[in-house]
Design a protein with these regions (language model features):
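Substrate-gating cap/lid region and adjacent catalytic-acid/histidine neighborhood
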Residues: 1-131
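Mobile gating loops/cap/lid regions near enzyme active sites that modulate substrate access
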Residues: 74-221
């Protein structure tokens, strides 16, 4: 599997549903104590850490947008990759952070921003810098190699290691950032968010597990 997500996934969704977590649709801005009470319903031991990691008590909107993106995409992608690996299959994960160049750009590396790079259509949409063109060519090579062989790596390309629980390929053309394999820069955030996912999966499993039989057999009429 080759899949991933973008740095600012939440910017397209948060304005219509201003919640940092899909598990708690009524989460409201507040101080640390109020937010801890709310978030503890979904993240019993991680609420305070999440507030600090995302600065929810001081910047609910920006922190909430980032948390929403990490929760909907990042934590689930990593969980699926780990399940895939347990079955003996390889996973290649990416984190795309290139912010499309535009003076009026306020959405960051928004949901689906990487797709024009993969299909070579970026220039007709917003134009490309030389760095964008290089990133697009790199990504197209990775995707074509994976489609052909199940492995994105190839001659002359930066190595993309399979995901082993930590490795992500950071795809970017932003100033001050480099494309390459690394431990995910949001690992601490995804680690904390994972508690909410595991709580829900445990509840779902319990709901689907048949109740144990009492062993009693009804007498025939």
């Amino acid at each position: 599997m080759l899949f991933g997500y973008n740095a600012d996934e939440g910017t397209l969704f948060f304005p219509d549903d201003p919640q940092p977590t899909v598990w708690l649709p009524d989460t409201q801005p507040g101080d640390e104590a109020a937010l801890t009470t709310q978030l503890s319903k979904a993240f019993p031991s991680q609420a305070e850490k999440l507030i600090a990691l995302y600065n929810l008590d001081t910047d609910f909107t920006n922190g909430g947008m980032q948390m929403m993106g990490d929760e909907i995409f990042g934590v689930n992608i990593r969980y699926v990759a780990r399940q895939n690996e347990e079955q003996g299959e390889n996973s290649y994960l990416y984190y795309f952070s290139r912010v499309p160049p535009s003076k009026k750009q306020t959405l960051g590396a928004f949901h689906a921003a990487e797709i024009p790079f993969v299909f070579g259509s970026y220039e007709t949409i917003l134009g490309q810098s030389d760095d964008d063109k290089a990133l697009a060519e790199l990504m197209q090579n990775y995707w074509v190699n994976f489609a052909k062989t199940g492995n994105p790596n190839g001659d002359g390309l930066p190595g993309w290691p399979r995901h082993n629980g930590e490795n992500w390929m950071h795809l970017t053309a932003n100033s001050g950032e480099e494309t390459g394999a690394e431990t995910h820069i949001r690992k601490a955030k995804i680690d904390a968010l994972e508690e909410g996912l595991l709580v829900k999966l445990k509840a779902l499993d319990a709901a689907q597990t048949p109740a144990p039989s009492s062993g009693a057999v009804a007498a025939p009429n």
